[in-house]
């Protein structure tokens, strides 16, 4: 993925950070790295996850396709993450519980970093012998926005861990599991600055999203647990 001439921030390294941070938070994220082009620009390389070790194709489909939705469907049309939950329950693998926990963890992470370009095309599934599995997470980037492309629960797209926590039953998770996931994500997110520096960003770069990430990590329902 090549940067655009008009980019005001280092898009490649911020996306690399997002994927690296996601893994730190226990998320199955796509493998990627940053290399320098001949003109010294940072370029993000992402490893394909729809191929086997010997190059055989693994059938992949976006949630947009699998849900029979149209481009643009999302919070404005009353659609969101719970539609993906419904698909996992109806068509998922024998590891349905694991898939639901993974999705919930991804939503928590997206809230923390402000990954609000989380439309249905950015959530995909791989078809394996035992059914559909969430593909590794991909195309994640921090932003300074506070509203997601998809509804977090059945009513709002507000980027809030409290909204996500209150919706845990709709994600088919018990309270203990939901608390544990959010607690784990926020605990690991405390070290986001160190991760960003390791990913080649400067301390000056961190100011671009510092306030948004700190806001995203706020969790009133679990304040006594994760601080």
Feature locations, PLM:
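Anionic ligand-binding catalytic core segments
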Residues: 1-227
